[in-house]
Amino acid sequence: MQLPANLAPISVEQDWQHTTAYPPLGFTPFAEGALGNGDTFGLYWPIGREAAEPIVVETWHDEWRVQPHFSSLAAFLSAYATAEDEYVATPSLADDPASPRAAYLEARELIAQRKPDAAIALLEAALAIVPEYTDALTLLHVQYVRAGRIDEAARVAIQAIISPPSFGGPPFKALQWLRTQPVPDGEPDPIWRACGQLSFNFGGSKENADYPVLLAAIDTYLEQGNYLSASTLMQTYAELMSAETVSFQERYAFAPAAFIARQIAVSAQLPNGSRDTSTLWLPDLA
C-alpha cells in the first residue's frame, strides 16, 4: 500500500487493527479533525487502488457510514488548515476537484437541473477513485438506464449490489432493475445469475435467504480469480452480517474474527497486495 508523501502533519493511529467489519478494511484513523464522538477522519485505500496514495474519508459512526470527502491527504490538510473551530467540512469541487463526495453531491444537483451528461461524467470520475462508492454507483446506474446504456447499467448495478453499505445504498433500484434483465448466455457473474434470489431486506427476521446467495457468490468470485469483486463483496457481507443479532450470526455460522481473517487473506491476492493497514507500520516498512 502506498503511503502519502508526507505523513508528518497528522497523528496516525499506527496500532490500528481491523477487527470489526466497520470501519472497512483499508482504513486507518488519524487524530486531526476528529469530533470526539466516534466520528473521525482517516486514510482509506479504495479496493484495487492499493498502489496509489490513499484518499481521506470521514466515518459517521452512528450511521455506520464512510464519506469519501478528500481525494488526498494534501487536500484534507489544506481544508484542515483553514477550518473554523477545527471542523473540516465537506469540500466543494472548487476546493478539491477530485473529491469523490463533492463529485457525487454536484452530480445530484446537475441531475436536478436536467444535465445528465455532466452528472454522469462526475460520477464516473468519483468511481474511478472509489470503485465501491455505493451511493455514486446507484445514482450512476439510474442515469445509464435513462440514457439507454444498458450494458453499462448492468455492470454498474452488479457493482452497486456487491458494494458496502458503509458507502451508501441500499441498492434496491439497481437490484430490481437487474432482475428484469435477461441473463446473457454464459454470463460468468454470480450476482447477475442469482439476482432473482436476492431481496436486500436485512434485519428483523430469524432467517434471510440472501446470505447463502452472497456467500456462494464470494466463493464463485474466488474460483474465478476475481479477487476485486470477492474482496468487495466480503466487506459487504461482513457489514451486513455484523448488523444482525449474535443468535442470527450463529445460525448462519458467521464467526466475525474468522471471517475478517479470511477477508484479509483474500485481499493479499489483489494485484497490488494486502489491504491490511497494520502492516504499513512494521519496522521494515515504516
Language model regions located:
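A surface-exposed partner-binding patch
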Residues: 1-48, 84, 95, 100-103, ...
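Compact, glycine/acidic-enriched structural inserts
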Residues: 53-91
